[in-house]
Curated annotation (Swiss-Prot):
PANTHER family: DNA LIGASE 1, DNA LIGASE 1/3 FAMILY MEMBER. This is DNA ligase. Inhibited by PCNA123 and PCNA323. SUPFAM superfamilies: ATP-dependent DNA ligase DNA-binding domain (SSF117018), DNA ligase/mRNA capping enzyme, catalytic domain (SSF56091), Nucleic acid-binding proteins (SSF50249). The gene is lig. It is an enzyme of class 6 (ligase). Its cofactor is Mg(2+). NCBIfam families: dnl1. GO terms for molecular function: ATP binding; DNA binding; DNA ligase (ATP) activity; metal ion binding. Gene3D superfamilies: DNA ligase, ATP-dependent, N-terminal domain, DNA ligase/mRNA capping enzyme, Nucleic acid-binding proteins. ATP binds at D258, R265, R280, E310, F350, R427, K433. It comes from Sulfurisphaera tokodaii (strain DSM 16993 / JCM 10545 / NBRC 100140 / 7) (Sulfolobus tokodaii). Pfam families: DNA_ligase_A_C, DNA_ligase_A_M, DNA_ligase_A_N. The active site is at K260.
Amino acid sequence: MEFKLIAEYFDKLEKISSRLQLTALLTDLFKKADKNVIDKVVYLIQGKLWPDFLGYPELGVGEKLLIKAISIAVNVKEEVVEEQLKVVGDLGEVAMRLKKTPQSASILSFLGAQSNEGLTVEETYESLTKIALASGEGSRDIKIRSLAGLLKKASPLEAKYIVRFVDGRLRVGIGDATIMDALSTAFTGSTSFRPLIERAYNLRADLGNIAKIIAQQGVEALKDIKPQVGIPIRPMLAERMSDPAEILAKVGGEALVDYKYDGERAQIHKKDKEVYIFSRRLENITRMYPDVVEYVREYINANEVIIEGEIVAVDPESNEIRPFQELMHRKRKNDINEAIKEYPVNVYLFDLMLYEDADYTMKPLPERRKKLEEVIKPNDKLHIAHHIYTNNVDKLMEFFYDAISNGAEGVMVKSVAKDSIYQAGSRGFLWIKLKRDYQSEMADSVDLVVVGAFYGRGKRGGKLSSLLMAAYDPETDTFKTVCKVASGFSDAELDELQKKLMEIKLDKKDPRVDSQLEPDIWVEPKYVAEIIGAEITLSPEHTCCKDMVSKGAGLSVRFPRFIRWRDDKSIEDATTPKEIYEMYKMKLRKKEEEQHTDEA
């Protein structure tokens, strides 16, 4: 399959913002894609060489190396590339322009660098893989030579997208939801098989692999997909509510209630002595927790199992729960053995999704929990999450306050009904989180995605100091703006913010962003931040829940304040408009109750 085809479609995709048009173009590309390399086509669209869970290195090519490779490929001095970059602001565009110059074309032809055969997807992928895997002494030269060789053979348009891919700025604005719609339409003629594709992807979070199965075996083959050790399952997510009586009613009157620990959610896979640990974002974090790997080998009584829990920092002396920030300190340590001693951890397990080749995701929670309890040998490092079963609101609240006093964030209230399956990759009311109140503030924080930024005034003049934040809408695969956040940042965080944002600056709005506001700069949706505020309120400026409450108005966070970056969350894990709408309704109900009490 020619890489030229992908480059041409990337060029078309970049020029449109309608999701329907994006899906139609992508459908067309998948129809033309070689069945043997469609997995690689999907990875390239996602802006990666392989799924994150493999833990392989990223390309590791900085701007200076890219400039050098381009200069070698087109036979000009590095200064020429740098000058063009100042004018254009996009190395991909620079590479394309320089490839079009008569000097570049004639010299390369004379050198025999341009053959009659164009680049193939396989050849391009192989070269990019070589660049990513190069390490140690001489790796810098290998990366430069490999990339320069690839760019020499590439057409101007191919060079543009190869450079953008390597630079981490592909900018085609396509999310996984759009890819799944396009796969369904390309291979079945409609989106009716999208739920089956999504179910398979949720159980085996490798969209390239799913695409290859569809292309080679047909979409019906996905019905046989089940969890597999080594490939993470997309995590089940909880809804949020603040009224304990309503929560119990929502889950059917009876619930399993777990502590909600302030740690790192981890999905742990074991097959014989092989252990893998994946983060909430499905990244391979095994090397960060060699102590947990040993605990699993020693205390989990199963040959093949996938379990889920929270890795929590504990005090080395008292074994009491420590804040999440201590895990972050541990991750920053270069000496992992020293980190283990200084920041020990316990693991609090709460679910089981695979046991000895049997898929447990479709079994009710009580059955999953029973099996989880059976596979853990008695020990003081791996624990079942502290929990109760209850149908009583008072007992729920007593347990909630017990959780808070013991260092937890709150509790997770979980349905124990017959339909209490593990909803991989979905957010629903089978699990509901109840977290502590923030006094006069919102009942809960929200996790929002940075989509743009504004320059400050006064002492913050010339600095990007206000962020345009958005919620993720899974139904439309778009980001709806919620608020502008300017408070809560320390001076050090503000300084770090400048670099962070300029690295992901875009020339125009990302196609997935739905905004009425025009920030000073647009950025690629990449970072998730936890935000707290006074309340959820109506706003004519923002697009989140637009027209749902009042015509012409959306919902916004009043007096928003930055709490922390949520590096453990992907942008698709951000708070949804539906959740924000529910929080707004909670506020209205609370005010009505207070008014009723005052009148009484």
